[in-house]
Amino acid sequence: MIRIDLKQDDMPDHWYNILPDLPEELPTPRDETGEAFETLKKAVPTKVLEYEFSGERYPKIPGEIYEKYMQVGRPTPIIRAKNLEEFLGGNIKIYLKMESYTYSGSHKINSALAHVFFAKQDNAKFVSTETGAGQWGSAVALASALFGVDSHIFMVRTSFYAKPYRKYMMYMYGAHPHPSPSEFTEYGKEVLKKNPDTPGSLGLAISEAIHYALDNGGKYIAGSVINSDILFKTIAGMEAKKQMEMAGEDPDYVVGVVGGGSNYAALAFPFLADELQSGKVKRTYIASGSKEVPKMTEGEYRYDYPDTGKVLPLLKMYTIGYDFIPPAVYAGGLRYHAVAPTLSLLMNKGIVQARDYDQEEAFKWARIFSEKEGYIPAPETSHALPILKEIADSNRGEREKKTVLVSFSGHGLLDLGNYAEAMHFE
C-alpha cells in the first residue's frame, strides 16, 4: 500500500492531552515578576487557558473546528516512501504523515483554527501572533479568514525579507504581517534602537505580539511550546494511529522535527499514550532540530523565559537562553531557543531522543528526497530526513524490516528561493 487515506466520516473527533499520562507531574510555570500570570489571563483566549491546565485526557473537538478541519484538507494521507526505502538499502519501511497536504501547506493550521475560534468566542478585536518562516503566520491568517477575525502577525525580520511568498499568502488571506522587531510596538522600537540590524528571533516576535494584543484589545495566540497548542495539533497523531492500524502496521520509530516542539509532539504523543499508561515504552522516539540552534543537544533543562521580553511566566524546558539570537538559517521555524515543557520532560526522562543536523546536511537530504519521492520538503522538515539513514544503517542485516513513521510537517514550494541560494542553483 502506497497511500493510506482516512475517510472524513472516520476522522477522530477528540484531541489527546498527554498531561495525565506523563511519568511525573509537569513542573509548574513560575511568575518571578508577579505580573506574568495576569498578563496571560488578559492576552490569551479564555478557553485556551482552560485547556492549558486541563486534566481531561481526550477532550472532544468542538463542531465548528471539526468542520473547518475538513474544509482545509483533513484528514491528511499517510504515504509510503518506497523509492527512498530502496535508496537506503531496503531494510526499513518509511511512512510519511503528510501534513503538507493542508491548505496552508503545513501542520500549523491544526491549532490555528482552534486558537482563532476561541479568540472569537472572547469577542477579540483581532488576534496577534509570532511566526518564524511563515508557516504559522500563514496558518493563522487562513484560520482568521475562515472565522472572520482580523489578524496581526509579527514575522521574524530575517524571514520577512527572505521568505516573501508566505508573507504574500498572509496578505491574500487579509492579514497584516509586520517584520519583527517592528515600529508597531514600544518593545520593538527599543530593540531596533539598540540594534537596527538585528535579524530578529521568535522570542522577540512573541514579546511584540503579546504587547500588541494587550495594548490594542486583541488576543495573543501561541504557535508552539504550550500544552494547549500541542493538544490542538494532536488531530494529526490521532489520525495517524487509525491509518497505521488500517495498514496493519505499528511503527517501531516515530520521528520528526522540533522548532518549539508542537509538530513532533502532535504526532508522537497519541502513540505514546498507551505506552505511558502501561509504564512500558516499546517504540523509539527521535526528534531532530537545527545544529545552528542546538537547544536539544546542547541546551540545559531548566526554567527559562519563553519570550525575549520576559513577559510570559518561566517554563522548565530545554533551552539555550531566552536572549539567544540565532543565525539567519533558512529553516526559520527551527530558530526558537527552547523546547516545549512536555516534550522536554520526556527527553529528560530518556523517552524521546534528540538529534541536531546542520543546514548543509539537512538540505542534502532534501535534495535526495525530492529526487526519489518527487515531493519537495520544507527546510524545517528536511531536518528529519538524516534520521532515516541512521535508522537504516543501524538495522542493516536485521531479518525483519523496521517501520518508521515520519511527521512530514510541510512542503517547500515557497522555499525554493532559499534552496536555490543554499545550493547555488543558477
Swiss-Prot record:
It is an enzyme of class 4 (lyase). Its EC number is 4.2.1.20. The keyword Lyase applies. Pathway: Amino-acid biosynthesis; L-tryptophan biosynthesis; L-tryptophan from chorismate: step 5/5. Belongs to the TrpB family. This is Tryptophan synthase beta chain. Its cofactor is pyridoxal 5'-phosphate. InterPro entries: Trp_synth_b-like (IPR006316), Trp_synth_b_CS (IPR006653), Trp_synth_beta/beta-like (IPR023026), TrpB-like_PALP (IPR001926), TrpB-like_PALP_sf (IPR036052). The modification N6-(pyridoxal phosphate)lysine is found at K108. It comes from Thermoplasma volcanium (strain ATCC 51530 / DSM 4299 / JCM 9571 / NBRC 15438 / GSS1). The gene is trpB. Keywords: Amino-acid biosynthesis, Aromatic amino acid biosynthesis, Lyase, Pyridoxal phosphate, Tryptophan biosynthesis.
